[in-house]
UniProtKB/Swiss-Prot annotation:
Region (Disordered): 241-323, 521-563
Keywords: Chaperone, Disulfide bond, Endoplasmic reticulum, Glycoprotein, Lectin, Membrane, Metal-binding, Repeat, Signal, Transmembrane, Transmembrane helix
Annotated Ca(2+) binding sites: 98, 413
Cytoplasmic side: 515-563
Protein family according to the UniProt entry: Belongs to the calreticulin family.
Native source species: Aspergillus fumigatus (strain ATCC MYA-4609 / CBS 101355 / FGSC A1100 / Af293) (Neosartorya fumigata)
Task of the protein: Interacts with newly synthesized monoglucosylated glycoproteins in the endoplasmic reticulum. It may act in assisting protein assembly and/or in the retention within the ER of unassembled protein subunits. It seems to play a major role in the quality control apparatus of the ER by the retention of incorrectly folded proteins.
Coiled coil: none
Protein name: Calnexin homolog
Cleaved signal peptide residues: 1-23
Amino acid sequence: MRFNAAITGALVSSATLMGQAHAEETEKKADATSLVEKPTFTPTTIEAPFLEQFTADWDSRWTPSHAKKEDSKSEEDWAYVGEWAVEEPTVLNGMVGDKGLVVKNVAAHHAISAKFPKKIDNKGKTLVVQYEVKPQNSLVCGGAYMKLLQENKKLHAEEFSNATPYVIMFGPDKCGATNKVHFIFRHKNPKTGEYEEKHMTAPPAARTTKLTTLYTLIVKPDQSFQILIDGEAVKNGTLLEDFAPPVNPEKEIDDPKDKKPADWVDEAKIPDPEAKKPDDWDEDAPYEIVDEEATMPEDWLEDEPTSIPDPEAEKPEDWDDEEDGDWIPPTVPNPKCNEVSGCGPWTPPMKKNPAYKGKWTAPLIDNPAYKGIWKPRKIPNPAYFEDKTPSNFEPMGAVGFEIWTMQNDILFDNIYIGHSIEDAEKLRKETFDLKHPVEVALEEASKPKLEEKAATPSVSFKEAPVTYVREKVDYFVGLAKQDPINAVKQVPEVAGGLGALLLTMILVIVGAVGASSPAPAAAAKKGKEAASAAKEKASEAVSSAADTAKGAATKRNTRSSAQ
């Protein structure tokens, strides 16, 4: 048992030293956000049909719209009153000097556009559309998608609206249960000349956090497309197979003039005409019958009514028997019935009738006259056409954001529209790949840390030792569930105390099993006494180590303030 005491003493000393070391470590910690090193924005040298980083001359390219939104479902006029600004992020800013286009108003219609230096013709080429979205207040209900507008010499930026013809719509949209990344393109029917929107099926979910998200769309001349989020592919498909309605109509359609013959038999099954109802089939037998074997419970009070006059009720003072009639007190449930199985006349319960069979019907058999499900004959589709290259989008002359959102401060940046996958990746490495890790670090640093919780018990050890120890242990267990190593660092006194207790119990068990003393009862008694003593020392270790650590920290703080 002297060995156990020595071990316990050593652990207590270790816990004290660990507590002092931890106090010093906590004292040295600085604000995590100040330790995050941010890169500085440098304009790219990449050239593209359209590349926007919202540098100082951005307003020479972008024009807010002052048009009115067209809405056939409402008589009210909606103007694009939402304001725009170019500024650095105010939330999780991951790059010094990096400005973006920011939505400034909540619950407002916003529209802004920029013309391309020259129209973008994608015939026979790869189209790459890439841009950053940073919802600084998260994205709960609103759009953050862009539109590539159809080339039109008559297009005036100030008149840009939801009615302005676009070629491609791409980007995130979130509201309620809707959460997706749009990819829609308008396709012209070569026979009728009419345009039809083709919507990508099974769209991926949008990212709605306050971090910058990079959305990339790649459409290749082989009609395949790919959507990437933060540089990772989230959707692959083809323009000919993954859009609704499909680009090309069916070659054949149902003949609208074809009619089902009058003698066509649609019934696959019919009642068996040779089947007969069994002689013992009783259709009149009831579904339930009285349970003749049931007996009245012994505590059933047949003479007690289920309700009685309310003994606490009193006749109103203004009650006139001549005018109002005899006053009858209201009734209340008989309290005696609550204590027994029931009151009043007893009737036996019902039970399912074993002889019940219900109405007899003949079993079904295959209909020998069945001809199958009738379908009209097929005829060639007069509106059929085949467009094998829908990626040859119509020429595009501008890019615009035409959105409505309940959140402001949505930031757009680093827009690339061109034909080079390599250049888009290079731009990503120059911008997103540098700022995004910083934003993640800033977000992590801004989260409340576990050690920020009430690590100090609500009472002192002298006031309530049991409560003090329990709160310390609970705090240690909560930390250990997420990070055991951090738990030992944060509450070393509890770790040391629990370790001492565990080691003592192991030694007691080993000693009890391997003891060869002729007096086992005495040995067991000594073991229990030793275990009890160890527990007391472990509790003392928790309090003394904590007090030692607190004292050390207090002394150091005092010296710091004095300096």
